[in-house]
């Protein structure tokens, strides 16, 4: 029913989700086609954007940019004007939150353009090469455009012990790909499904003769947490799945990347601030004395975002290969997705801002952080975020600005000029940017200074 149309009083449900409906002069609705994307995933406890386009007798609903209902209403008593009203339907106790409500009056060509711009189903296609800007001397090539209707949305990749790519669908399973030769592309026949019964993998790495994956399942069809996947019978197919640690996570601030340690003895698990802290070993590096620590009354987010989520925020765990011992290596992050070690064994991550805090004193931009053992980075609920000058809160190496951080990696081994081989690459999902972060040891401290460069920029 998400995105359907329910008419006033006795008319009731006129058009359900995915339906194109025409109501005749006799008031009877007829389903004349389908609209929308039946693979679209909508999470009811996260913010969703509802768009209603009403022009004459035509009304279209969209959720998160995808059309959910298209109605042509010729009913003799159909309303053509009125008021905007927000209501709860009768039934069991429930909560509905609204924000950023905007009303735009459409007239003439604007009204026609609003209707004409709506498509039934855009589908996933790769950004055209001519819409991608790269640093001078570099060139981008399209290897494969993922068909969203059959292979979902790919959110993570790694290489296995034979140099093949393993990729994950955000709401589906895994695929295996043999990388093509230089100048060649991939076709549908090159994409192999992995038989392992696993889904919603947000992070993965090949280590200790196995594939370790972090599951973060919005739809709760599979328990989130850390899993190990192996080949049970030597047929070169990953088919055995072991859950090493179940974790409680919510939304896209959950269980994320898995990173191997430089000494090859452990793993680092990256989690966002909506992951409930798990049981820790006594050797955990972060002192378990954190708290919200507000001298003045707390001021949670005025829009209601994460009002009940308190310290310690996002945690980086150090984990043994069997997943039995979890140590909190560092915490106090908002929503880190990935991390990477440099040649000296120093760990770096890219933390998120809180976009609703923009222009308030406690706003903290997305930032590159050097993560040291036992460190606290000061994320707290609402207005309680710790400024960088607090003595018990480590500052970032570099502030980036507004964005949505995802993957990070160093360029070691790439056939790039030395400057770019040594760079840390940080991907910003919301602005479609890949930054090259150029780090330099600071002679006046034990940390680094850094500058950023827009290495790749894409436009949808």
Which residues does each predicted region cover?
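Carbohydrate-interacting regions of secretory-pathway proteins
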Residues: 1-120, 227
